[in-house]
Amino acid sequence: MDLLYISPEFPPNYAHFIENLNSLGVSVWGLGETDFYFMPASLRSALTWYARADLNNADAVQQGLDELLEQKKACGHAGNFDLVESHNEQWLTLEGMINEKYGIDGIKKKDLPRLKKKSIMKQIFEGCGLPVARGERIADINRALDLADTLGYPLILKPDEGVGAGGIYRVENKDQLKSHLSHIAEDYLIEEFIDGDIVTYDGLTDYDGNVVFENSLIYGDGVLDYVLGKDTFFYVSRQIPDKLRAAGQKLVPLFDIRRKFFHFEFFKMGDTYMPIEINCRPPGGAILDMMNYSIDDDLYRAYARMIAQG
């Protein structure tokens, strides 16, 4: 099997995916932005070949892909890659474009809106009967002001397409709303402010979309507290409430998540779970390592084993 891994250098702990894939006989071809020799020796030795490219430049990416395919052919690996993986929301669009161009199974261009746009996620949540925060994508400032009057303050202003807490604002009054909107060019959503705890339903699916691992995080604070520089915290829960599991497992097939990690965020209000957004990637940073400790196992190895077995 030949797997193209986008950005093998970041985050650093994700090198364990590549090392485990390599140990199970998967040929991993890397396309990233860092210098090859800036990566750890263990990662370098696990890559069959590595091409460096500016991943935000389409021409540079194509040159990198051409180099990899040429080397792949020279090594006796004819044809395209079998799979493409990024494990990083930043490169999900690139992953879909490569799959589309080379006819590789996986996320395609048509799948990206539901995996990246919060307004479309919200429609899917509502369509399957889950409660959502009141609000909508705003078309212009007049509609935004009318909607704000209906929802009341405080409210949340967040980008329709964004990663993590970037670009999210808590708006206390009309003047603040006007000020924020005057600096915004991209599509944004306005939603009512929800006062609730934030929990997650996280996991890994196999090739058929079956959940083969599940876990949950409990946040001590919300993402806005992190944006404000507060010393926030979160922890892994070994016990997943039945209603949270049911809501999470309802969403997995609706978003067609196959052979991938997922990270779903919910508001918890009593025993009600309100979805916030979904992410078709592992939870960020060192959270996978936390989850490994919580289950006394190795998710990097489990992922590699699932991929290698097909």
Could you describe each region identified by the protein language model?
Residues 102, 162-163, 228-232:
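Helix-loop-beta segment of a Rossmann-like dinucleotide-binding subdomain
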Residues 192-257, 261, 268, 275, ...:
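ATP-dependent carboxylate/phosphate-activation module, predominantly the ATP-grasp catalytic core
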Residues 108-119:
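A short, structured active-site edge motif that brings together acidic residues
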Residues 1-110, 142, 309-310:
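ATP-binding N-terminal substructure of ATP-dependent carboxylate-amine bond-forming enzymes
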Residues 65, 69-72, 148, 181, ...:
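Short hydrophobic patches on amphipathic alpha-helices
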Residues 105, 161-164, 281-284:
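A short, flexible beta-alpha/helix-coil linker loop
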Residues 117-195, 206-208, 234-246:
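Active-site nucleotide/adenylate-binding loops and adjacent lid/helix of ATP-dependent enzymes
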